[in-house]
């Protein structure tokens, strides 16, 4: 059963996005309270009205804040999700976030990458907030500080959207490069991708850390060797393994790595004992054969 490694930087980035989402919700709640400030009179009892009378809508040429919100998204919102009169939108949003968390856990257990799951989840949360908490039209009595806050929030949202589009474009370019000729080596486009590649390499090496591989010896025989005998830190092994042609590309795609080739490469570069035991020419041929077999499959 494969293990899932989540990078601390990815978790911190996710927590930062959640904090931004909470701040957005607080601002939305404040706008909703401001828009409902005029609803301080006695409520109209409609229990005794005929059933069809309750469905009537009054058209006013002077739209209020609440009426503007209703015109912007009421029709589609009622078709997709009918909210009861007594339900609090904040509670519904909290319930939605709980369901999102459960879905993230399920997707991670199924083997999907955390960064891919999180980017999709952020887009879904933004869409939910946009549909269910639309921005009300401006009022003449609106406070200037609220207007300034709204403009700053809009600029931040636009900037974040532009950054996401830019990163997606870079990721697509990297994928096209990776799918080109085998001689072209995939390179990480940002820190998150690079960390995910390192995590995949470390995961596969750690699973076979004590597994012995056969290597040609100088005495025309063979000898057994494993990663544990290198006496190296796993991070240093991963750093050296990334220099093996084709390994970062295979790790990015989630494919199986040629671990014997990686071990031979790291051993030649860092272990004097391995250098004394192995026959270099035969090892080079074995490593090249392993690379060709894994990159062509």
Curated annotation (Swiss-Prot):
Record-level GO cellular component terms: host cell; host cell cytoplasm; host cell nucleus; virion component
Cell cycle in keyword set: no
Annotated region described as DYNLL1 and DYNLL2 binding, given as residue ranges: 138-172
Biased composition (Polar residues): 158-170
Highest rank taxon of the organism: Viruses
Modification note: Phosphorylated by host PKC and by an unknown kinase.
Record family assignment: Belongs to the lyssavirus protein P family.
Protein's UniProt name: Phosphoprotein
């Amino acid at each position: 059963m494969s293990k899932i490694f989540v990078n601390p930087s990815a978790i911190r980035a996710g927590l930062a996005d959640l904090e931004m989402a909470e701040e957005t919700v607080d601002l939305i709640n404040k706008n909703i309270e401001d828009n409902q400030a005029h609803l301080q009179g006695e409520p109209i009892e409609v229990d005794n009205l005929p059933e069809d009378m309750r469905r009537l809508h009054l058209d006013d040429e002077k739209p209020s804040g609440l009426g503007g919100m209703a015109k912007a998204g009421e029709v589609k919102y009622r078709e997709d999700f009918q909210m009861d009169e007594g339900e609090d939108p904040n509670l519904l949003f909290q319930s939605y976030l709980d369901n999102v968390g459960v879905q993230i856990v399920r997707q991670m257990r199924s083997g999907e990458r955390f960064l891919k799951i999180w980017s999709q989840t952020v887009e879904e949360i933004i869409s939910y907030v946009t549909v269910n908490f639309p921005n009300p039209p401006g009022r003449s009595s609106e406070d200037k500080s609220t207007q300034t806050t709204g403009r700053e929030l809009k600029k931040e949202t636009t900037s974040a959207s532009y950054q996401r589009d830019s990163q997606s474009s870079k990721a697509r370019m990297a994928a096209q490069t990776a799918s080109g000729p085998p001689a072209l080596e995939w390179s990480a486009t940002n820190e998150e991708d690079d960390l995910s590649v390192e995590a995949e390499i470390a995961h596969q090496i750690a699973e076979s850390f004590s597994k012995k591989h056969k290597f040609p010896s100088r005495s025309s025989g063979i000898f057994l060797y494993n990663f544990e005998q290198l006496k190296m830190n796993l991070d240093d092994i991963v750093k050296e393994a990334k220099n093996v042609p084709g390994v970062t590309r295979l790790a990015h795609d989630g494919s199986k790595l040629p671990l014997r080739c990686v071990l031979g490469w790291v051993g030649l570069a860092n272990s004097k004992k391995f250098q004394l035991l192995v026959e270099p020419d035969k090892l080079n041929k074995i490593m090249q054969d392993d690379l060709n077999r894994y990159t062509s499959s």
